[in-house]
C-alpha cells in the first residue's frame, strides 16, 4: 500500500528535520521540498560524516532516491549550483537525481540587497531574517512580477523581465533605503551562464509526482522552518515568508491533498528560536546556556546562536492542530541529560490579569502579554545519547516523554537520541 509522508517542524524551526527525513528515505522513492528557499539548514550525519543542506532535499544522500524541488520553493541559481558542487565533490550524484519545477520563482541579487537594506532600516525592530532574499522573492511572486525558472531559458524574455523588475527594486533601493543599486548587466550575464547547467534538471514536477504515486512509490515531503514561523499561523510578524504547515505540501508541489497521508511532527525535547520574536518559555539563565552548549544551538544557515527554553506543550498543541499531526518525533532528548529538574509549559497566564490560556494566542502582540505556567518533573543523570531501545532509557526520561504525549494529546512515533541516522528509537514507522 502506498503511503506518503509529510515531515514538518512543530516549533520555530531547527527541530532536526533533516536527520529524520534522511532516516525515512530508506522507504521512499522520492523526497520533495515544497516551500522556503536556501534559508533552510538541514543537518545530516551518516557514519560520522556531517552534511548541511540548504536547498536540495535531504534524500540526496540515498543513491536510489529521486529528489524534487517544487514550485513553492524560491530558488537561488547560485545557491543551487554551489550546493550541487559541494555534494558532487563528495561523490554524490545530484544532476541525475534532481528534478526542479520550472515554476519556481528565482531569488536574484536585488532580492538580497532589499532584504539587507530593509533589516538595516528597521534597526532594533528587525525580524531577524537570514538575509538571503527569501522574503522579497516571495513578495515578487505575490505581486506577480517574479521571474520564474522557466524564464531563464529564453534569453530575450529573461532580459526584458529582468529590466522591468530591476528598475522597480533599484528605485526602492536608491530612493527609499538610500543605498547602492544593483547592476543589470552583471545579473543578466551571470544568470544566463548558470542556465545551461540547470536546464537539464528542469521538469514537470506535478506530473512526475502523480505518476510516481500511481506506480506505487512512497513519497516524502520535506518541510522547512517550523509551523510557528508560518506566514499565516505563526507568531506574526516574526515569521518567515511562506506557509510551513503540512497543507503547503500540496500547494507547493502540485500534488493533490488526497495523496498526502501521514504527518510527522518533529519536536525538540526542549524549545529553541533563532532571531527576534516572542518566546514564552525562553531561559535567560544558566539552564538556557546549558541547553545551548550541549545542543550546539547555533543556526546551520546563519551561525547565529539560538535562544533556548523549556518544552512548550501549548505551542506544540497549536502546531499539531493546524498540521493534522499523526505522530510526533522527539529529537535531542540527550541534550537534557544531567539536569536535575525539567519543566513543561502546560498553559499561559496573562501578566495583566488572572486570565488563563490553554491555546497559543495569534500574533506577537498577544503573546507579549502572557507568561508560562509550568509543570515540574524530575530529570536524569544517566547518558541517553545513542540509545535505540526505549526500555533502556532512564525511568525519569520515559516518564518525561509519556507526559509530553499526554499534554500534547498525540502519540510519539519516534525519538532521536543523537545526530546519526542510527541513533533513533522507533515505535511506529510513518510509512507503516
Swiss-Prot record:
Keywords: Cytoplasm, GTP-binding, Ligase, Magnesium, Metal-binding, Nucleotide-binding, Purine biosynthesis
Gene Ontology molecular-function annotations: adenylosuccinate synthase activity; GTP binding; magnesium ion binding
Location within or outside the cell: Cytoplasm
Pathway: Purine metabolism; AMP biosynthesis via de novo pathway; AMP from IMP: step 1/2
Cofactor(s) of this protein: Mg(2+)
A single cellular component GO annotation: cytoplasm
EC number from the UniProt entry: 6.3.4.4
Signal peptide: none
Binding site for substrate: 300-306
Residues annotated to bind IMP: 14-17, 39-42, 130, 144, 225, 240, 304
Biological processes, Gene Ontology terms: 'de novo' AMP biosynthetic process; IMP metabolic process
UniProt-annotated binding residues for Mg(2+): 14, 41
NCBIfam families xref list: PRK01117.1, purA
Role: Plays an important role in the de novo pathway of purine nucleotide biosynthesis. Catalyzes the first committed step in the biosynthesis of AMP from IMP.
Record-given protein name: Adenylosuccinate synthetase
Organism: Nitrosomonas eutropha (strain DSM 101675 / C91 / Nm57)
Gene that encodes it: purA
